[in-house]
């Protein structure tokens, strides 16, 4: 029965297909293989999109939607783009998270019966970009696969991640707990995520385009074997990945998908890196955001730490900088090696020094991405010429590095990495023209002298006229016919024309081609051979050039790993040179590391803020086992957040391997950096500002260790005063007694400044400011002890709060202070040392009621009184003063 149904379905499908034109049958077959992808169908000089694809493309790309004819009774909606401009349209689609299947003509229109044969040669998706026109120079694009592992009860126990930078071939794996997924995706920032239907809900919203792939692609055993096949190894033990489970399953799905989009093997994926949380200083999403490492809180690219540090001369160096900032190593060994290299670069002699080195680096091409395209056989002619010119410049660059490398082992390693693969430069020099055309189809790509046949075809095409003149001269001399002519027309091609009176002198090798009234036209074997070549010379030259170019690409494939080694060395050298330039220009110093717990910064400066202002006030920061928590008080805008952030940034820069903005700095081990700074709600997640604040605080309290650096800014401010104060006090105590981490704790709760009485490991510091008239001057200097005022009204005045509001606030503040002073049990003043209050005796009379004249006076705003009103008020106050509180109450 099932067989009958299948046969009926196939017959119905065949009948439906037969109603379409042959070309539309071909298109619909290809479209059925890529149902969720926009199909760019090559027709002559255009890529056409049909039906629903055309409607979507017209909307997204602002194309004209047309309708031409019908197929199977359905109007054919069309939209097209010129083939030479397709990359710019693909770039727009990728930004919208769309994918496109590029369908090319692979058959010969002259010999095809019916539609020209076509097939999809590549699929462009958000995570599989390799073309230079589709990529940002200074950031990587990652394709990530996610596989959820389950325990025996069917509960998610771990998550395996595999992510690939297809443009470079860098493959990484990780396995983590389910609650760590959001932080991992925030760090990796994949452009596209591959997941099976049952795991898509695990992916947090807004983390990249999600592509569904079959669940069987994530099979762990198959994934492990596929990784071994890809890396050409028998076991993954050498990469530390053999014992992984879900990560290997994710890698298998990723490799299947990536190879399918490219339509070929991934020859440049030759190694992998297993990332372990213990390798790097932990930076959660909140910390990355608050420290503005690569993006400001407003979502812009600058001013950030990345934009300040990125003076790299190559795109490779800029991308490596971004990676280093998000992956600071915990072990200080790597940072110390980088500091040593920076010192050697700064101390180098002028002829081989920093400026000379950076000048040479500016001539270097993006070897990393060119190598990726080379491995995928999609490198263009100018990619190869750029690679050739870079390899030609490497010997001089290596000499400069070698002169400096004796003082830094890291530079010695890089100098060795800069040796081009043997034979690669020679091949590129011989094969590729000095200034090749942008595309192979335009010709002029292969250098003269590389191939004799191509040179001859070019000569024929370019020097056809000269050949005919030379042949005519030779034939006149050979035959003695002075008026012999060699000519050409489109009907008969090339011929030798002899007048009737001279035909008796025609040699035996002349063959008659055409008889005219007064002349005979002949062809010779030499001319026939030339004709065959000349008439197709240009076409044949382009075909020969294409074949030779493909041969060059194939010949370069064995050099992929060598090119990757060179690219890695160039990127690191460029970044170290950029660090050295920043250190020299901005007066930064090499930090020191110690195994003892502590952070000591002498005259530290916020690197980004300092670059934005004319003068920056440097401050010290000292944290050690006897001084683990600094309670920071002071006015708003006084610099509390800047001081905290600069401490974290200086520590991060030190471990990344950069010099730091300070007079001196010394760091003990740091395993994580936490921040609880700023106020923002999560409307999409249904969380209030206070809930976000408490969630971040909970993560810190649960995860911080004695080696963690914690920044807490005004914790507890999102609720009532007493709730907030109680929470802030309890959190600070917990950080001191349980976490015992390095902590910078900024607060406006002055009651917290009593914490050092109970915990000697806490200390008070404040950001100084002085009043000037009704205004305030921020000194931005960190001084010992608590602040004595909040300066809230002065800051509000600076912010432009209207004067009547400021006056009303000042009156109400005086009223509140008066009430507080009159209370039997006074509340602690916000920014004054707590008074010593004697216990009242039992027979002590109650506190006096404030005098009505004083209360009335406090209600006044003298600036709003007219002369007559002031006089009336004076009489009123006189009466109140004489009557007293008791009379006023009556």
From Swiss-Prot:
Disulfide bonds: none annotated. ATP binds at residues 634-641. One of its GO terms (cellular component) is cytosol. The keyword DNA repair applies. This protein is involved in the repair of mismatches in DNA. It is possible that it carries out the mismatch recognition step. This protein has a weak ATPase activity. NCBIfam families: mutS1, PRK05399.1. This is DNA mismatch repair protein MutS.
